[in-house]
Structures are given as structure tokens and as C-alpha cells.
């Protein structure tokens, strides 16, 4: 199953990652406000999320001439938030895309990745994300998903939880 392959590769990638948790750096990042993803989605009427994505496992390379900041700037005035794919191996994303977009665009940003470690939550906050995506199928134990939701809330996020069936919905709500 592709999700299992992505998650396995993500764990290996994180083991080799240069990112090291630094509480002072995280607290400094938390002093700076980020645009509220929740407020952008809770407004009256239709809410639109633009996506910055270079590739996908199903479609391959989507945009060969890929400039994430320029794509994000094109969304300004047309969308309420931006989803930034940061998964490197299958989507050709990068955490740096998120950081650069945050520096150049004043919209709520969703870090869209396969979160398998709390470090990814901390890193997302440091890079300027407004929230993160948690996939119930990846964090498929009640205590793990609940723990990650609490960690995300602890850094100021209201995480977006993706579910695929009734069991996962119950898991997310418990």
C-alpha cells in the first residue's frame, strides 16, 4: 500500500534529517503570531485552500517549472489559506518551501506532510505554519493521535485531521 511505503520512507528520512529540536528556537517562533487557519476556515461562506504541490505518486511531476513562492503569491486574494506539501520523497516537497512562502505571503499555511514524529510539529511551527495535517491512518492508535493533537495545540495549532472511514472519525473524536 502506498501510504505504508510513504510512512516507512518518512521515518527513514527523519532519522537522517538535519533538524534538531531546540526549545529556545521553538519559543522564539511561538512569540511571532501566525495567521489563523481555523479562523480562515470558520468564516461564513465558502472557504478555499490553495495547494502548493510539485508532484504526487499518482500523477508524477505536476509542475516541472516549480516556484513555490510565486505559486503562493498567485493565490493571494483568491484563497483563504494555502496547503504546502513538504514531503520530499513522493511529492518532491521541502520544509524550505513552507518557510519561504511564510516569509512572502500573509495567509494561513497548512503544512501537508506525513507526520510521524512530534519533531515535525515543532519544525512546522518554527517554519511559519499556521497548522499541520494529521492523518488518522498514519497515527492509528488512540493515544498516538490524541498525543499529536495535544502537541499541536501546545504550539498554537488547531490541527486538521484527515480520516478515511468511520473508525478513523471515531479515533479522531475520542
What are these regions (language model features)?
Residues 1-109, 116-118, 151, 156-174:
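Conserved N-terminal beta1-alpha1 strand-loop-helix module at the mouth
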Residues 119-120, 141-145:
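Short, charged, surface-exposed secondary-structure boundary motifs
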Amino acid at each position: 500500500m502506498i501510504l505504508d511505503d510513504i510512512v516507512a520512507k518518512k521515518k527513514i528520512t527523519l532519522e537522517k534529517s538535519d533538524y534538531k529540536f531546540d526549545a529556545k528556537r521553538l519559543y522564539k517562533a511561538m512569540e511571532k503570531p501566525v495567521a489563523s487557519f481555523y479562523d480562515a476556515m470558520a468564516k461564513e461562506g465558502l472557504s478555499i485552500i490553495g495547494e502548493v504541490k510539485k508532484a504526487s505518486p499518482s500523477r508524477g511531476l505536476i509542475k516541472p517549472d516549480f516556484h513555490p513562492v510565486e505559486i503562493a503569491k498567485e493565490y493571494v486574494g483568491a484563497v483563504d489559506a494555502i496547503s504546502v506539501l513538504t514531503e520530499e520523497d513522493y511529492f518532491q516537497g521541502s520544509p524550505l518551501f513552507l518557510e519561504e512562502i511564510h516569509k512572502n505571503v500573509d495567509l494561513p499555511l497548512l503544512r501537508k506532510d506525513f507526520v510521524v514524529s512530534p519533531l515535525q510539529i515543532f519544525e512546522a511551527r518554527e517554519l511559519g505554519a499556521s497548522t499541520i495535517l494529521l492523518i488518522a491512518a498514519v497515527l492509528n492508535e488512540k493515544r498516538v493521535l490524541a498525543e499529536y493533537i495535544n502537541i499541536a495545540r501546545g504550539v498554537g495549532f488547531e490541527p486538521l485531521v484527515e480520516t478515511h472511514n468511520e473508525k478513523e472519525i471515531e479515533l479522531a473524536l475520542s
